[in-house]
A protein has these predicted regions:
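C-terminal beta-rich recognition modules with glycine/proline-rich loops and embedded aromatic residues
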Residues: 27, 72-84, 88, 92-208, ...
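Hydrophobic core segments within long, regular secondary-structure runs in both alpha-
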Residues: 8, 12, 21-35, 57, ...
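Solvent-exposed beta-strand/loop surfaces of large extracellular or lumenal domains
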Residues: 231-256, 273-279
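Hydrophobic, small-residue-rich alpha-helical packing segments that form membrane-like cores
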Residues: 1-5
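Well-ordered alpha-helical scaffold segments within catalytic/enzyme domains
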Residues: 6-20, 55-68, 212-216
């Protein structure tokens, strides 16, 4: 499945470089077909989302920048939920009994290649020698080959390719986060981020609030309005002073912003529930397996309400208000706080 995504993404890239309208239209059609097998939160039929999502994110960027900015919405959901949540943050997530199950049993492949011992009292990384017990510590921060509904660390599920593709997804979003224009800059994603143009601070999913602090006087700032922001109730305020702001299409345009000015975009952020189709590959064909109800706040998944595994992923425990200062996002200067 990942190979299909890779080839298709290159087709879109070629169409964009050659200005081939027919090829681009065909590429868009393929993208929409492939993404129809992916849940709104980014779970893929092949359950290898770190890789497949990265290619879909890349192709969606081509579409967002050329034909339809609404594709930024899809990118945001995939990165915010699947890519970020596949990170292996703590070795406490490793479950020995599940790791034991995830082995080659007879002729059946279950997660793990190779000839491993009958028990996993000793981790199967014997080439680390005396440091074998330290493997889990060294693995923290990597990314898992994992479905969104579970988060189990078994041998071979934490892979270099998963980590590399996840980091590439983050890089693509960071690269497109703030884009310079002749009059100022555009903001396409709504994360906490900082570069030479501005500092961005997101309060989601706790509060409908997004703040920008320009690094210099800026004639025009355009901020993309996600589908879940109510344009009629969107308010823009600044401290100190005032700014001119109006809605133009799917962007709010802010003019004459001053260096160091805190510009706040305020909007209602309500919970809602969707029902997502979950596909799996059967003889290399995506087949509908089940439906799952998903609770969202904005573009952030708060809970999966159905079909969690025996070892459900530790979804958003790190997003509790106890994990941030005073109910506000932690500011990490010069870095992205996902």
């Amino acid at each position: 499945m990942y190979g299909v995504f890779t080839v298709y993404q290159e087709v879109l890239r070629a169409a964009r470089l050659t200005q081939d309208a027919a090829l681009f239209a065909r590429g868009k059609q393929i993208h929409d077909r492939l993404s129809s097998y992916v849940t709104g939160y980014g779970a893929t039929p092949c359950t290898e989302p770190a890789c497949s999502n990265m290619e879909l994110i890349y192709s969606a960027i081509h579409l967002a920048e050329t034909v339809d900015p609404s594709y930024y919405e899809q990118i945001d959901r995939y990165v915010r939920n699947q890519t970020t949540e596949a990170q292996f943050r703590t070795k406490n997530e490793w479950k020995r009994e599940l790791a034991h199950e995830g082995r080659m049993t007879g002729g059946e492949f279950r997660w793990v290649f190779g000839e491993y011992p009958d028990t996993l009292d000793i981790l199967p990384y014997d080439y680390y020698g005396e440091d074998a017990d330290d493997v889990l510590d060294k693995s923290e921060g990597g990314f898992l080959w994992t479905d969104f509904s579970e988060h189990r660390f078994v041998p071979a599920s934490l892979m270099l390719c998963c980590s590399g593709h996840a980091m590439r997804s983050f890089h693509l979003v960071a690269e497109k986060m703030i884009r310079p224009t002749i009059r100022g800059f555009d903001v396409n994603f709504h994360y906490s981020f900082e570069n030479e143009y501005a500092e961005l601070i997101s309060y989601e999913p706790f509060e409908g609030k997004f703040m920008m602090i320009p690094k210099k006087d800026t004639q025009e700032i355009r901020v993309r309005i996600p589908a879940y922001w109510d344009k009629e109730q969107l308010r823009v305020c600044a401290e100190p002073g005032e700014v001119q702001a109006k809605t133009e299409g799917n962007y709010v345009v802010i003019r004459n912003a001053e260096k160091g000015q805190e510009i706040q975009l305020l909007y209602p952020l309500e919970s809602h529930i969707t029902e997502e189709n979950v596909f799996r590959l059967v003889d290399q064909v995506p087949c509908l397996q089940f439906k799952v109800r998903v609770e969202w706040r904005g573009n952030t998944v708060m809970r999966l309400l159905d079909h969690c595994s025996d070892n459900p992923k530790m979804i958003y425990k790190h997003r509790s208000k106890d994990a941030i200062y005073g109910g506000k996002p932690m500011k990490i200067s010069g870095r992205i706080h996902w």
